[in-house]
Amino acid sequence: MFLSIYNFFYNLLKDYFIKKYKSELLESAEQFKKFDKVTFKEVEIHRLAVPLQMKFKEQNEIISKFGCYFLCILFVGFVVKEIKNNVEKCFDCFEIDLLFKGLVSKGCLRGDNAFVNSPNAIFANLGIDEDIYFDEKHYPSSYVPLESDILIAKYKDESSSFYHFVIVANDRKTVIWDSLGNSKAVSNGYIDSLRVFKIQNKAIVQRVKNRLELYNAKFRNNLEVA
């Protein structure tokens, strides 16, 4: 008698809770269905690959004083590397300092004034020497670049005879990236000569160019905010 009453109420309660929780689960599922209708857009956030020169004052005084050409070469190299490997990496001052010291130890550049002995040796250490190379000569400002060329311009400040390197577009007028932000050598000077870097991997030429344009816009926006 007791067992039959127990079984009756047990089954009754079991049916009740099954219906209750099944209903709650269905309601939850309906809520998630609503979220399924929402489309989320993936937004790419591209940060400039190399810090500005003045940010190295505490980390590496040599880079902060003399590192404009070295940083331009790294900037170009990192853009080629991220396009080639489809991996974006923003390097901080600490990482650049370690890389600088490693490249000095291998003879790629001098540690006392950041003079670059071999851009191609730097590219080899970055693993991109088959993708881009430096044409070992100085070109005049009148040089007409190929589509696959990346230009680093050597500017001379007329008022101080100070030299400074920046990355420029193929029109030789647009500054893509300036390690000093807005350097006086660019605003008060002229292009003394050009360093020409040639992309050998034809499959990445357009993507590298597009990424440099994007970084140029990012660079300009950062200057406006500052």
Features from the language model and the residues they span:
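Short intrinsically disordered terminal tails
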Residues: 1, 223-226
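Active-site-adjacent structural segments surrounding the nucleophilic cysteine of cysteine proteases
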Residues: 1-108
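Conserved active-site-adjacent core of cysteine acyl-enzyme catalytic domains
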Residues: 3, 78-212, 217
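Extended hydrophobic/Leu-rich segments
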Residues: 17-18, 25, 32, 204, ...
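Detector for intrinsically disordered, low-structure N-terminal pre-sequences
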Residues: 37, 42-44, 195, 207, ...
